[in-house]
């Protein structure tokens, strides 16, 4: 559909569609340790989904589409959560820096993301075009239903 952007479609459906596109293309460089790692220090277990790296890459690309100039630190804040401390009160805990860094590096390898001169990363015009194209496909699929 012409004129459809990432902001116009359901974010969950868009992230699923983009993750499927990244997996199907086979160009995203996935580290070999993805099946043994936790995504944050406040998590107790590793993720159940074996394709979590593609989902995280799609979610990160969407975040960079909506607000560019985000770096590793801001990605750890976005993917942070509640650290449970047993009988003591819970506090906020950031996500994994290593996972955020590797996801951004993998997206850079696809030429979807580039380093911003003001700090952080931003979407390239090619990356923005890919995301808008997938958003159009998601909108067209929703219109059929």
From Swiss-Prot:
GO terms for molecular function: fibroblast growth factor binding; identical protein binding; protein kinase binding; RNA binding; structural constituent of ribosome; translation initiation factor binding. Transmembrane segments: none annotated. GO terms for biological process: antimicrobial humoral immune response mediated by antimicrobial peptide; erythrocyte differentiation; maturation of SSU-rRNA; maturation of SSU-rRNA from tricistronic rRNA transcript (SSU-rRNA, 5.8S rRNA, LSU-rRNA); monocyte chemotaxis; negative regulation of respiratory burst involved in inflammatory response; Notch signaling pathway; nucleolus organization. Belongs to the eukaryotic ribosomal protein eS19 family. InterPro entries: Ribosomal_eS19, Ribosomal_eS19_CS, WH-like_DNA-bd_sf, WH_DNA-bd_sf. Gene3D superfamilies: Winged helix-like DNA-binding domain superfamily/Winged helix DNA-binding domain. GO terms for cellular component: cytoplasm; cytosol; cytosolic ribosome; cytosolic small ribosomal subunit; nucleolus; postsynaptic density; ribosome; small ribosomal subunit. Its main location: cytoplasm. This is Small ribosomal subunit protein eS19. The modification Omega-N-methylarginine is found at residue 67. The modification N6-succinyllysine is found at residue 143. The keyword Ribosomal protein applies. It is found in: Cytoplasm; Nucleus, Nucleolus. SMART domains: Ribosomal_S19e. Component of the small ribosomal subunit. Part of the small subunit (SSU) processome, composed of more than 70 proteins and the RNA chaperone small nucleolar RNA (snoRNA) U3. Interacts with RPS19BP1. Component of the small ribosomal subunit. The ribosome is a large ribonucleoprotein complex responsible for the synthesis of proteins in the cell. Required for pre-rRNA processing and maturation of 40S ribosomal subunits. Part of the small subunit (SSU) processome, first precursor of the small eukaryotic ribosomal subunit. SUPFAM superfamilies: Winged helix' DNA-binding domain. Keywords: Acetylation, Cytoplasm, Methylation, Nucleus, Ribonucleoprotein, Ribosomal protein. The modification N6-acetyllysine is found at residues 23, 111, 115.
């Amino acid at each position: 559909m012409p004129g459809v952007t990432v902001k116009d479609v359901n974010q969950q459906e868009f992230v699923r569609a983009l993750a499927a596109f990244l997996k199907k293309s086979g160009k995203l460089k996935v580290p070999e340790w993805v099946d043994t790692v936790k995504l944050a220090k406040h998590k107790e277990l590793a993720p159940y989904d074996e394709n979590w790296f593609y989902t995280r890459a799609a979610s990160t690309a969407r975040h960079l589409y909506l607000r560019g100039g985000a770096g590793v630190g801001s990605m750890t804040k976005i993917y942070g959560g509640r650290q449970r401390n047993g009988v003591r009160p819970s506090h906020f805990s950031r996500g994994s820096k290593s996972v955020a860094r590797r996801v951004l590096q993998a997206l850079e390898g696809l030429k979807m993301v580039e380093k911003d001169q003001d700090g952080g990363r931003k979407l390239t015009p090619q990356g923005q075009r890919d995301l808008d194209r997938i958003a159009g496909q998601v909108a067209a699929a929703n219109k059929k239903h």
